[in-house]
Amino acid sequence: MNAPSGLHRIVIVGGGAGGLELATRLGRTLGRTGRAHITLIEKARTHFWKPHLHEIAAGSIDVHEHATDYLAQSHWNGFRYRVGQMTGLDRAQRLVHVGPVLDEDGRPVTQGYARPYDTLVMAVGSRTNDFGTPGVAEHAIALETPDDAERFHRRLVNACLRAHMQATPLAPGQLNVAIIGAGATGVELAAELHKATRTLVSYNLERIDPERDIRIHLLEAGPRILPALPERIAASATGLLMKLGVKVRAGSRVTAVGAQGVQLAGGERVDAELVVWAAGVKAPAFLAGLDGLETNRINQ
């Protein structure tokens, strides 16, 4: 567990895009040359670039063809990968505490341990922020991980198979998708789903008419979609989405999510069988309890 004597110990917590890139660069420049000992701590076994999660959700790409194995990446690039999730920090002793890892049967893979450091980099990324909206945890899917995206895709396929096989007419909102939040993730998912649903139906699900039966609602609380981008880009994207048949609804704040759809602030209900929450992010909650670190209301 210890670095070679005398080497500067750099510990990076979090193997997202930033953490993995940093570990790789430091490993190549300092780790390989024996000038520092680089350790990346991450609970996942593989890395997937989050901006492509909407493509997994739509079924456009296979996650296993686009994932990077942490063990292999560390071996090739001069750093050490250690599986686990940070649970605490002792700043006085310069120790990162890491919890035990269990397999799918509940058996221990690794025990909890403390990793010493000289330089600590926190690159833990973000988590979904549902702003306390009722029903989000129970009835919506947030695309945080490849598992989330694959779960959404399975539900989408099952919904289409169910609709094709049922003898009764479609219920209100059946096959509809409500995407809450019109940032980059929401906009890209809406466009990708338009193509994906039509491809799926073309596989002999002829009882479903995608133009008639499938509605994609893109709901944004703010005055326009893509609020982080220039207005001209947002306007162009809005026009393109509307041409695809996506129902773009700015100024539509969601107050609750239920089993049959979402409730808007004005009292209107949007019926939907599938709901995706893409409305906001915050830093992981455990940061608020770390030794001596100050955080704001979203744990930054």
Spans of features found by a protein language model:
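Internal nucleotide-binding/catalytic subdomain
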Residues: 212-292
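Beta1-alpha1 glycine-rich phosphate/pyrophosphate-binding loop at the start
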Residues: 2-88, 184-229, 276
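A conserved short coil-to-beta-strand element within the FAD-binding core of flavoproteins
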Residues: 83-95, 250-261
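Core beta-strand elements of the Rossmann-like FAD/NAD(P) dinucleotide-binding domain
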Residues: 106-119, 265-274
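Short glycine-enriched, charge-decorated loop/helix-capping segments at active-site entrances
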Residues: 53-61, 137-141, 233, 291-293
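Glycine-rich, N-terminal phosphate-binding loop of Rossmann-like dinucleotide-binding domains
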Residues: 15, 100, 124-125, 266, ...
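FAD-site-proximal beta/loop scaffold in flavoenzymes
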Residues: 138-167, 261-263, 271-274, 278-300
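Glycine-rich dinucleotide-binding loop and its adjacent helix/turn
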Residues: 124-185, 194-199
